Amino acid sequence: MFELIFPGWLAGVLLSLTTGPLGSFIVWRRMSSFGDTLSHSSLLGIALSIAFNINSFYAILILMSFIAIILAWLEELLPVSLDTVLNIISHSSLSLGMVFISLISSKKEINITNYLFGDLLSVTKNDLITISISSILILSILLFRWHSILSSTINEELSQIDGINVLYARLTIMLMTAFTIAIAIKFVGALLITSLLIIPPATAQHFSGSPEKMVIIAIIVSILSVTGGISLSVFYNTPASPSIVLCSSFLCLISNIKKHFY
């Protein structure tokens, strides 16, 4: 039994190392809709990968990176709220992806459930290697660019005065988030990956007094959620990814109760 669940648990832990800090930046920037936009657009990437018979990871990564670059640029130019643009792109790409998949499924057999909810317990050794390399790469970039990204998140005007390229810092976060989602979507699913990005940092903010502490607590909450969710899946035969999200939501609920009553 241990040999069956350990790869999935380890994959969840490795993903937590990146979703914790990236999710914290998304929460600080109040860009929770950004994660939804990328995860929903991944369905369009999946449809295109099936239609053109290319690797789904590359199709999703290219599409989401393109969307991230466009959004970083549009945020500088558009007079409307970024949330408005995010919602338009999110639902348009989701609808377009579902239409394409519906058209393709008449010729090819497609299991859309795996794309929507993932399968964390199907992780292979090669998957673990890919996730490990990706996590090391993203964490290295975050550590190297931590000051500029954090400064531009807290106050863009002061960051510009200090000579920080705010657009570049914003684009770095968006592209790293796109890369993480492209890696994780196979195991967590398009509909649940945003939850793993947003809920742990939302839980951690009630216990932290500094950005660094919030990131660490978000990672711990995420690892606890992965451990609890996989345990629930093993003992009660529930889907792994939804079980992880439920555990994460439960921890968030507990943190809110603590905030209001203690």
UniProtKB/Swiss-Prot annotation:
This protein's GO CC annotations: ATP-binding cassette (ABC) transporter complex
Biological-process GO terms, alphabetical: response to zinc ion; transmembrane transport; zinc ion transport
Keyword Transmembrane attributed: yes
Protein's UniProt keywords contain Electron transport: no
Membrane topology reported for the UniProt record: Multi-pass membrane protein
Function: Involved in the high-affinity zinc uptake transport system.
Name of protein: High-affinity zinc uptake system membrane protein ZnuB
Species the sequence originates in: Buchnera aphidicola subsp. Acyrthosiphon pisum (strain APS)
